Curated annotation (Swiss-Prot):
Phosphoenolpyruvate binds at K21, G91, R119, Q166, R342, R383. Transmembrane segments: none annotated. Pathway: Metabolic intermediate biosynthesis; chorismate biosynthesis; chorismate from D-erythrose 4-phosphate and phosphoenolpyruvate: step 6/7. Catalyzes the transfer of the enolpyruvyl moiety of phosphoenolpyruvate (PEP) to the 5-hydroxyl of shikimate-3-phosphate (S3P) to produce enolpyruvyl shikimate-3-phosphate and inorganic phosphate. It comes from Campylobacter fetus subsp. fetus (strain 82-40). Its main location: cytoplasm. HAMAP family: EPSP_synth. The active site is at D311. This is 3-phosphoshikimate 1-carboxyvinyltransferase. It is found in: Cytoplasm. The gene is aroA.
Length: 425
């Protein structure tokens, strides 16, 4: 992908941008817990989320698309498929399906692309195995392909060492489908699963950082009836664009306003960007509009609520690179085990653009400056590719392996062009 620098500021308003990826995955997976048809509109039609629909079909669900709505009819009982369950590039799908299938009768094999199959899965596999799950795979069940022999699991209480919505969701599902559980995390991670499952009728209670889950015991949850809002993580790229291109402004409508999903916007606000939030509705989640206007950015130190902005870290690095002073991100070691080592790759790419950047063990330090045009290897990481495309609006950029953007945001280039950018895919 080649992105040319913008010659003029932009003033844009986006309505349907990119449906929320986290919620779309969960809509597909959680629909299996009901005995009635779930109706999902505005489902994200990206490679990863469409793979989740294909997986639930292999598990016995019927998926239809009618008049812009996905109708998901769950099976009476999850079936043991005769094919591998392909998760593509999605760690979210693989980890959540692990939790669900560990407590279901049957034999299941989860696999992904060459990047996903090198990512660590032990953080989910280990606690599941401690409560009786039968999981095997490469590197002692740390790497996919993973074979799961599902069955009844024991009640468990688990203290997680990481704040991860994926780990939490996997263990909540394992508890729901077996004997129940208690789960505690070191800090609050994104909470879509609890909100959605509570809305479906699950018995989940929370006290501080601890969640208690009552088992379904053969009962079913209510179906999901949901219009998936815009994804704040995907939309954040355009928020950064507005914040770094002088005179620019963007309004993003129908966007998820969950506090665990807009932390990166709060950081951008602390840096000086003018941002307003307007809530327009609330069903499972608060939904509304976000307006971002350019203002000269100042440096910031970020070391709290990291799990709330972990996906936006590469895009935040672009804002850091365009700010006055030295900005730091810490307590983000999780970035080392994403689609690539996002700390090392982000720092190396910024250096190629003439920006002073330093790797920290758990983050990075970036001195803002005037970036240069460069050729960047995204290492097959969709968020690295999109982040440096945004920097390209300021100085021009050539991004290699940009085809992986389609795993999460197929229309990314379309909306860049809507800002006035010249883009060659």
């Amino acid at each position: 992908m080649i992105v040319e620098a913008l010659n003029n500021p932009f003033d844009a308003e986006f309505n349907k941008v990119s449906s929320d990826k986290s919620i779309s995955h969960r809509c597909a997976i959680f629909s299996l817990l009901s005995d009635k048809v779930s109706k999902i509109s505005n489902y994200l039609e990206a490679e990863d989320t469409m793979n989740s629909l294909k997986i639930i079909e292999k598990l016995g669900a019927k998926v239809e698309f009618k008049n812009g709505v996905y109708l998901i009819t769950p099976p009476k009982k999850i079936v043991s498929p005769n094919a591998i369950l392909e998760c593509g590039n999605s760690g979210t799908a693989m980890r959540i399906f692990m939790g669900l299938l560990a407590g279901c009768d049957g034999f299941f094999v989860l696999s992904g692309d060459k990047y996903l199959n090198e990512r660590p899965m032990k953080r989910v596999a280990s606690p599941l195995m401690q409560i009786g799950a039968k999981i095997d795979g490469r590197d002692c069940a740390n790497k996919a392909p993973l074979a799961i022999r599902g069955g009844e699991l024991n009640y468990f209480a688990y203290n997680s060492s990481v704040a991860s919505a994926q780990v939490k969701t996997a263990l909540i599902l394992a508890g729901l489908c077996s004997a129940g559980c208690k789960f505690k995390e070191p800090e609050l991670s994104r909470d879509h699963s609890e909100r959605m499952l509570l809305g479906m009728g699950a018995q989940i209670s929370q006290s501080g950082l601890e969640i208690e889950v009552k088992p379904l015991k053969g009962a079913y949850l209510k179906p999901l009836i949901l219009d998936v809002p815009n994804d704040p993580s995907s939309c954040f790229f355009y928020a950064v664009a507005a914040a770094i291109i002088p005179g620019s402004k963007i309004i993003i409508k129908n966007i998820l306003l969950n506090k665990t999903r807009i932390e990166a916007y709060k950081v951008l606000e602390k840096m000086g960007a003018k941002i307003t939030y307007t809530k327009t509705s609330s069903t499972y989640e608060d939904i509304g509009d976000i307006c971002v206007q350019y203002s000269e950015l100042k440096s910031v130190d970020v070391n709290q609520n990291i799990s709330w902005l972990i996906d936006e870290a590469p895009a935040l690095a672009i804002a850091f690179a365009c700010a006055n002073g030295v900005s730091t991100l810490k307590n983000a070691k999780e970035l080392r085990v994403k689609e690539c080592d996002r700390i090392a790759i982000t720092v190396a790419a910024l250096k190629k653009c003439g920006i002073e950047a330093v790797e920290l063990e758990d983050g990075f330090s970036i001195k803002g400056g005037k970036p240069n045009s460069a050729t960047i290897d995204s290492h097959g990481d969709h968020r690295i590719a999109m982040s440096f495309a945004i920097l390209g609006l300021k100085c021009g950029m050539n991004i290699e392996k940009s085809e992986f953007i389609a795993t999460s945001f197929p229309k990314f280039s379309y909306f860049l062009r809507e800002l006035g950018a010249r883009v060659e895919d």
